[in-house]
Design a protein with these regions (language model features):
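Positively charged, low-complexity intrinsically disordered leader regions
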Residues: 1-34
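Flexible loop/turn segments at secondary-structure boundaries
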Residues: 43, 75-77, 127-128, 196, ...
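Short, hydrophobic/aliphatic alpha-helical segments
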Residues: 29-37, 66, 173-182, 222-223, ...
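Short acidic, glycine/serine/threonine-rich loops at helix termini
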Residues: 78-82, 129-135, 227-233
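Divalent-metal (Mg2+/Mn2+/Ca2+)-assisted nucleotide/phosphate chemistry catalytic cores
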Residues: 11, 91-92, 98-99, 103, ...
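Conserved nucleotide- and phosphate/pyrophosphate-binding catalytic cores
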Residues: 204-411
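N-terminal catalytic cores of NTP/NDP-binding nucleotidyl/phosphoryl-transfer enzymes
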Residues: 22-80, 188-195
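A charged helix-plus-loop insertion that forms the helical arch/lid used to bind
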Residues: 80-96
Length: 411
């Protein structure tokens, strides 16, 4: 197997390939141009988008040429793959704004140089497409019977598949054809839920050009408990730090299950596999902290990763810099005259609604750090928090449950 493909396989990026021997032989001959697509249906990428992007960087490092295709055209429809219902339609203007934000995120992560890594946008060839001509030229090569055998469509047939979504596979296949024509792109990579779309694109190019191209998919990443990776209590784990604060991003990885550590090291860091295995075989808490730091450094930079790590240490009583913790400011007068503990938690937006906070306190899950640095439980929902609750720095460190912290600064 070609060395680049072996790297993907060793790190857990390999699920299916249309012709692994043919692709391996092509890669042995020299650089292969490949692409991964991302639809800008939201203002930020989330962790679910990261696997193809890490694969892109591994292939690029091995000498191949990557294209990040931003799907401003396909985002107008929405991909039915992996969805139980039709994606909510958003305006063209909102899609264009999302494109700008996502391109900037990808550029920080990938570093587009226009040679070894570049972007394209399928809006260029889809926005003004003549539908009749498209049906004659492209649609005539597709079998409805075969399309309905693919998992993405079979699942949606149970809940209702709209005609507009049914067109998505044709459009994604057309993307592959256009990238083959524009950039000599010979490989599409993506999650395994894209297998049907990728195979259809490979087949379309063969029919239209007689050229052989390839498709490769990655396993859909789930946690060891079977849940979707990157999902939190607040929803998706976004790369935009305004949507998911860096501290929360760090803490997500710091708190992954023991069984997931090695897998996530291989997928979401660039450390050699042997080093990933060595770290994961050692102290598991140290391994999780290293995992969290490595991923946060890749996405947000080393300085932000250091701050998040220091904030986590301070939150959990292991030293560190508490100014790096999530912080809320409240009026000094509220503390001076006293504020009910439920109202305090609500004021700093920790613990959910007031009824949630009441239950949290009644179940013994609300804490503060006293002047001696000792964490103390709020045992009474009627507790009034005043200046005697402040720590030696005149601040409050609050905790809700096992993992949510807030540094409260009185102004």
């Amino acid at each position: 197997m070609n060395a680049a493909l072996q790297i993907l396989k060793d790190r857990g990026f390999f699920q299916q390939c249309t012709d692994v021997d043919g692709l391996s032989a092509l890669m042995d001959k020299g650089p292969v141009t490949f692409y991964v697509g991302t639809d800008p249906t939201g203002p930020s990428l989330h962790v679910g988008h990261l696997v193809p992007q890490f694969a892109l960087l591994h292939l690029r490092k091995a000498g191949h040429i990557g294209i990040d295709l931003i799907g401003a055209g396909t985002a107008r429809i929405g991909d039915p793959s992996g969805k139980t219902e039709m994606r909510k339609m958003i305006s063209y203007e909102e899609i264009d704004e999302n494109v700008k934000k996502i391109e900037a995120q990808l550029d920080r992560f990938i570093g587009f140089d226009g040679k070894t890594a570049k972007t394209d946008n399928n809006k260029h060839w889809l926005a003004d497409l003549n539908y009749i001509d498209f049906l004659r030229d492209i649609g005539s090569h597709f079998s409805v019977n075969r399309m309905l055998t693919f998992e993405a469509y079979k699942k949606r047939m149970e809940t209702g598949l709209t005609f507009i979504e049914f067109n998505y596979q044709l459009l994604q296949s057309y993307d592959f054809l256009k990238l083959h024509e524009r950039h000599n792109c010979c490989l599409q990579i993506g999650g395994d839920d894209q297998w049907g779309n990728i195979v259809a694109g490979v087949d379309l190019i063969r029919r239209k050009t007689s050229h052989e191209v390839f498709g490769l998919t990655f396993p859909l990443v789930t946690r060891s408990d079977g849940k979707k990776m990157g999902k939190t209590e607040k929803g998706a784990l976004f790369l935009d730090k305004e949507m998911t604060p860096v501290f929360d991003f760090f803490q997500y990885w710091r708190n992954v299950a023991d069984a997931d550590v090695l897998k996530f090291f291989k997928l979401f860091t660039f450390l050699p596999v042997a080093e990933c295995e060595e770290i994961s075989a050692g102290d598991i808490n140290a391994a999780k902290e290293r995992l969290a730091w490595e991923i946060t450094a890749v996405i947000h930079g080393k300085e932000e990763a250091d701050k998040a790590r220091d904030g986590a240490k301070a939150a959990f009583g292991g030293g560190g810099d508490k100014t790096s913790m999530p912080t809320a400011e409240i009026s000094r007068s509220l503390i001076s005259k006293g504020i009910g503990v439920i109202d305090l938690y609500a004021e700093v937006k920790l613990g959910g609604s007031k009824s949630d906070i009441r239950r949290l306190i009644e179940q013994g899950g609300a804490y503060y750090t006293d002047k001696n640095g000792t964490e103390t439980v709020f045992s009474d929902v009627k507790t009034v928090v005043d200046e005697k609750f402040l720590d030696k720095d005149g601040e409050l460190i609050l905790r809700a449950g096992k993992k949510k912290f807030m540094r409260v600064v009185c102004k």
